[in-house]
Amino acid sequence: MESLHQAYTYIAQRLNIPGWDDEKVDVKKLVRLYLSKESAGQWLLVFDITDTARLETAGSSQAVSLMEYLPASDQGAIVFTTTERKTAVTLASQNIVELPPEMEQDMAQQMLEMCLISSANKPEVVDLLLKELAYLPLAIVQATAYININKITLTEYLLLLAKKKEEAAEPISTEYENVIGLTWLISFEQIRYQDMVAADYLLFMACIDPRDIPLAVLPMTLSYEKGIDAVGTLNAYSFVTKRTAESALDLHRLVHLSTHKWLKKQELLSQYNQAAITRLLEVFPDDNHWNRSKWRRLLPHAKFALLSGLSRQENNTRIALAHKLAIALFHDGRFDEAETYFDGALQSWKEVLGPEHPSTMSSIGNLALTY
């Protein structure tokens, strides 16, 4: 729900739809109505990685259908990408184009050759590597990035893959997730050896939403240059994609998943989750109207961090972030969601500080505003 809200807000702002900045207006319905009009002209909407046709609201047992927010016009078209067949049928009926996760061998070979700096490779070794990588584009990109940076041969990388496959524990989920997990692990261990700041950045990002991560949210470093170098390292290993115009980063879903699973396996998830919550609290702006674009961008990250982790043990930092999140949602006109977080913060303050504490009383007042 949060990513859809963010995307529709961006669309409404770029199209300058009247009322887009009115906190009492549901921007998702506003965009749907605008694009459904003939006067909107021709348009194309792309929903990338749509895992479900149901939109969950944090703290609520109810969900709404994505279909409620889809515009309808003879001048427009909507494209969904998804790995879930049920979702595809729900959203597109019979208008489905099935694509295998892996590439055709010839195309995969062309991609490998384009990504590699050295072109002097034996065909049989190339074929073997592609087979081990299951012809997956992301696996090919990660593997070639490692090969190029560390100046090793394809055979040496195959040996690394074999070693990590032996060391790996139980399978992650599917074959292609296992392959991505192996290429990720090889690169991540090298990053930890070469650039610990880059490794910390990646572990931090595993505890927030993987899309549109502002560079300003990343943990502080001893110097600006070290931070820039760390982002460069992650980009060189194809772990992140830069959004230059927005000064932000994106993580591929499977990179995010692999990193999150590694944290859990190493029993570090709670530690890094708490660090993410602490950092988000530091950078989350106040509810001033002029800060709206800033805190809107941080909403999905705050939500993810508060729902992530293992124990979810309540502490002042976690509760304070939930309270700030509730205030932001309230000023964004999303009163039901705000109520959920205000109520959660209130119950937590009562438990941690007692019913008469000023923070508890403040939460009671804020909760009353949502009714």
Model-derived regions: residue spans:
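Residue register of alpha-helical TPR repeats
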Residues: 320, 359-362, 369
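Aliphatic-rich helical/repeat scaffold segments used for oligomerization and domain docking
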Residues: 1-347
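A general secondary-structure boundary signal
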Residues: 69-72, 360, 371
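Canonical tetratricopeptide repeat
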Residues: 140, 361-364
